[in-house]
Amino acid sequence: MELTDIHCHILPGVDDGADTMEEARKILRLEYRDGVRTIIATPHYREGMFEPAMKQVVKVYIQVREMAREMGMHLYLGCEYHTNSRMVKDLRRRRRPSMVGSSYVLTEFSGAHNYEKIRNQVYDLLTEGYQPILAHIERYPCLREDIQKVRELVDLGAYIQMNAGAILGESGSPIRKFGRQVMEEDLLHFIASDAHGVKYRRPNLGACAKYVSKKMGHSYAEKIFCENPDHILKEARRQANLRARKRNKAKEQTT
C-alpha cells in the first residue's frame, strides 16, 4: 500500500517545520521508509506568526520537490491556513495556495475557538466553492468533547483530518479513544503525519497505517491513506484543466 501524507511541514525555513534542506531530505527518507510515496507540503500561514513570502515558499518547494523526485516520490504544494477573516479573499486572489490548487483547503483553528466559529468558517468556505479539511481535530475541545458536533460538520460538507500520533496514542489515551470513535462512526477522511522534523514530531504514517489496518480493516486503511488523498490530486487536475480552458478562451477572444 503506497501511502499519501497530506499534511507535512517539510519545507525548510518557512515555518516551524524542517530547519534545513538536509533535515527535509531526512524527512523524505523517513517517509519513504514508511511506505509514503506522495506528500503534500503544507507550510503554515497564520497571521502575525507565520507569514512566509510566497516567492520563498515556491523556491524552497521546487528544491525539495526535486529531492523527492530523485527518491521516486511525488511532492505537491499546499498550505495549512489558520483561519482569519480574510481567508476566502486570500484564496480567491491566490495569495495562499489551496491543496495542490484544488478546491480542498487544509483549515486550522485554535483550541480556544468555539463550535460556532468553526461551523461559520466551514459554511463560508463551502459557500465560496471550497472544500475545507479540518486539520488535527483532536486539538479542538469543542469537537473532542462532543462527537455529534463532528458529525454535524461532516454533514455540512467538511472533511476531517487527524494526526497519526493522536491515533497511535502519543497524545494520551483519551485522544486515542476519541480517534477510535471517529473512525468507528465513519467520520474520518484523512490521517496525516503533520511532521515537523526528524526529532520533534517525526513522520509516523507507516506505523499508523498498520495500526488502522489491524483495528479497522485493510480496505478502510486504503480509503484513509490512499483513496481519499487521491481525490485531492484528481480534483487538482480538474481545476488545472478548467483554468487552462479559461485562459485559452480568453486568448481566443483577444485574437
Task: Please provide the spans of the model-predicted regions.
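Extended substrate/RNA-proximal surfaces in nucleic-acid metabolism proteins
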Residues: 51-161, 239-255
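Mid-to-C-terminal alpha-helical segments outside catalytic/metal-binding sites
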Residues: 205, 210-255
